[in-house]
A protein has these predicted regions:
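Sequence signature of WD/YWTD-type beta-propeller architectures
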Residues: 2-3, 29-170
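Sec-dependent bacterial lipoprotein signal peptides
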Residues: 1-29
Length: 170
């Protein structure tokens, strides 16, 4: 008989009071503040400049540098370690924007080389770089991969207007 009485006592609590109690209990358990990844942030702080981050699954691509020499960097978040990108960074090119796919295999890069902007696709496993033509001609500014890495969206300046081109990648 004690169980029915306990149920009856709960039945006497107004629904709004029960809802308030539930919110207070759950609110105390949830921490909705962002937490910095201290180890990774300290590692990134060793570079004088870090900009244009692109985050995808377990990968962080960014442009970083010292003493005016910027280059694309790739970090595997689960290991907190940089990944080499042989053949991607050129001393005579200035990186503008970067994106990385969810597997860390493909990186898209906008860079300035000899006074012009170009879009290139880097395949990490092949250490290969492929120029992606912008048609009709324009100046690429920003980019983003689709979730599966097969499609690339590129913001392109044409005639003073910003447009978005969506490219299916080979």
């Amino acid at each position: 008989m004690s169980r029915p009485r306990q149920l009856q006592r709960w039945a006497l609590v107004p629904a709004s009071g029960l809802g308030l109690a539930l919110c207070l209990l759950l609110g105390g358990c949830l921490d909705n503040r962002a937490r910095p990844l201290l180890g990774l942030n300290l590692q990134l702080a060793h570079t004088a400049v870090n900009r244009d981050p692109a985050l995808s699954s377990d990968w962080l691509a960014l442009i970083g540098g010292r003493e005016g020499r910027e280059q694309v960097r790739l970090v595997r978040l689960s290991q907190g370690a940089p990944v080499p990108l042989p053949g991607l960074n050129r001393p005579d090119a200035r990186p503008v924007a970067v994106a990385v796919d969810g597997w860390g295999e493909r990186l898209a890069l906008i860079r300035e080389l000899e006074g012009r902007s170009e879009l290139v696709l880097y395949r990490r496993s092949l250490q290969s770089l492929q120029l992606i033509p912008i048609e009709p001609a324009g100046v690429p500014h920003r980019l983003a991969f689709s979730a599966d890495g097969r499609v690339l969206a590129v913001e392109v300046g044409r005639g003073g207007l910003s447009q978005v081109d969506v490219l299916e990648l080979p």
